[in-house]
Swiss-Prot record:
The record marks 288 as: Plays an important role in substrate specificity. It catalyses: (6R)-5,10-methylene-5,6,7,8-tetrahydrofolate + glycine + H2O = (6S)-5,6,7,8-tetrahydrofolate + L-serine. (6S)-5,6,7,8-tetrahydrofolate binds at residues 176, 180-182. This is Serine hydroxymethyltransferase.
């Protein structure tokens, strides 16, 4: 049987400008499929799956083939604990060069004083930020006060007292229902809540937006050591100048998690007081989402925290992933281009267009709209849960995720809302006309979902139904959009058998 690569090259024969990256990508799939068929098949099936649905999960995107190829090489074999030119292992010169270039690119892209590119994820980056703050603001002064040079010099009793002192300090962050993230400290099941006394701030019940006066009041009351700002499900921008002033008034560290909107900062959409870099003491982010890179994290910090963060090993990390760091470097370089800036602005334009068409058709959006890349639909008036909407939309080829809303009466599993984002559809090249069509498809589906009737004649709270004629129409409309805006068009799916 002819290989995938042979079929691809036969089909491409005579075509001008044959893309080297797509050839290399297909060659890798070809090898994997023949050497480890079950794994290769699953990878190809995922590619087919992603090409057959509209990806509207706000935290997902599509990395370029160049980014993906940068991860698939022998860099994965190298141990390199430490930081560039200060490793705990020998023969790290090439990894040093890659990590140094990646960090310098991050500093250039964001205008940051320092950049640490090793975190494996946004959660790792957030944990490192918290540990760096604890080390700088609590542990360091305590060790100095006791007359020691390092924490290892403390007696067992003194160390126990220090841990108790750390636990008494307050971290103030956005609650989960108000759009915060698990790693912002307000979810007790998460390790972050176990490091300090973590307290939440909420959005205003009427406006569903963060109330800076209320945050300032809470800061004056609780005198936190750390003020966390950022979000995973909030459709407006933040004023980091105001948040910095609030933090400074009580001597708190301002830590911003910009995982969701880093690409909008890099692309010049969020500027001045909406850009956290000039104001925050520490900024964390993922490298996927709006940055379109590999799954990973970054920490951007002021000089005060640079030394501590670059000692992430042994603070809370072991060996980094040099192959992923190489992919981060590629993605960050892509984000320096003019095309990326155009992309970032289009992401927000598309989100606003989507929101406008939802509202015209009577759907309620949290905060009344969007200023960024996402929007949250309140499904309460439709009588269905976020879980049901997520499942039904998935069945017709649209990927969204269920999401809690403030004062959610349904609960954190089923939820009363769904979150939608435009980063991935914008990467495919879709614009305002396509957003109108997407909105029309979603509204028609949501308005025709009914609750499934149980055997006892009651209605299910977790399962819904969609009339087959509506489902077929929606699938056809989704397929039409995807046929005009295919994922990785340079990869011919006809060869992927």
């Amino acid at each position: 049987m002819a290989s995938l690569l042979h079929k691809f090259l036969e089909n491409a024969s005579g075509k001008k400008g044959q893309d080297l990256a797509s050839t290399a990508y297909l060659a890798a799939l070809d090898h994997l499929l023949h050497s480890f068929p079950s794994i290769g098949k699953s990878v190809i099936d995922e590619l087919k799956g992603q090409r057959s649905r509209l990806k509207m999960i706000a935290s997902e995107n599509y990395a370029s083939i160049s980014v993906q190829l940068a991860m698939g090489n022998l860099l994965t074999d190298k141990y390199c604990e430490g930081s560039p030119f200060k490793r705990f292992y020998s023969c790290c010169e090439n990894v040093d060069a890659i990590e140094w270039e990646c960090a310098e690119t991050a500093k250039e892209l964001f205008g940051a004083e320092s950049a640490f590119v090793q975190p494996h994820s946004g959660a790792d980056a957030n944990l490192l930020a918290m540990m760096a703050i604890i080390t700088q603001k609590i542990q360091g002064p305590a060790v100095k006060r006791l007359g020691y040079k390092t924490i290892n010099d403390l007696t067992d009793k003194e160390y126990a007292e220090l841990k108790a002192e750390i636990g008494s300090h307050v971290c103030l962050g956005p609650s989960l229902n108000s759009g915060g993230h698990l790693t912002h400290g307000t979810v007790r099941m998460n390790v972050m809540s176990k490091l300090m006394r973590c307290l939440p701030y909420e959005v205003n019940k009427k406006t569903e937006r963060f109330d800076y006066a209320e945050i300032a009041r809470l800061v004056r009351t609780h005198k936190p050591t750390v003020l966390v700002a950022g979000y995973s499900s909030y459709s407006r921008r933040l004023n980091f100048s105001t948040l910095k002033q609030i933090a400074d008034d009580c001597g708190a560290v301002l830590w911003v998690d910009m995982a969701h909107f880093a690409g909008l900062v890099a692309g010049g959409v969020f500027v001045e007081e909406e850009n956290p870099i000039p104001f925050a003491d520490i900024v964390t982010t993922t490298t996927h989402k709006t940055l379109r890179g590999p799954r990973g994290g970054l920490v951007l910090a002021s000089k005060e925290y640079d030394g501590i963060i670059n000692r992430a090993c042994p603070l809370m990390m072991g060996g980094p992933l040099p192959h992923v760091i190489a992919a981060k470097a590629v993605a960050l370089k892509e984000a320096l281009t003019v095309d990326f800036k155009k992309y970032a602005h289009q992401v927000v334009d598309n989100a606003r267009t989507l929101a406008e068409h939802f509202q015209k058709q009577g759907l309620r959006l949290l905060t009344g709209g969007t200023d960024n890349h996402m929007l949250i639909i309140d499904l309460t008036s439709l009588g269905i849960s976020g879980r049901i909407a997520e499942d039904i939309l998935s069945s017709i080829g649209i990927a969204v995720n269920r999401n809690t809303i403030p004062s959610d009466a349904v609960g954190k599993w089923d939820t009363s809302g769904i979150r939608l984002g435009t980063p991935a559809l914008t990467t495919l090249g879709m614009g305002s006309d396509e957003m109108e069509e997407v909105a029309n498809i979603i509204v028609k589906v949501l308005r025709n979902i009914t609750l499934r009737r149980n055997a006892d004649d009651s209605f299910s709270k977790s399962e819904g139904e969609l009339p087959e004629n509506i489902a077929q129409e929606a699938r056809a409309r989704v397929a039409d959009l995807l046929s005009r805006f295919p994922l990785y068009p340079e990869i011919d799916l006809e060869t992927l058998v």
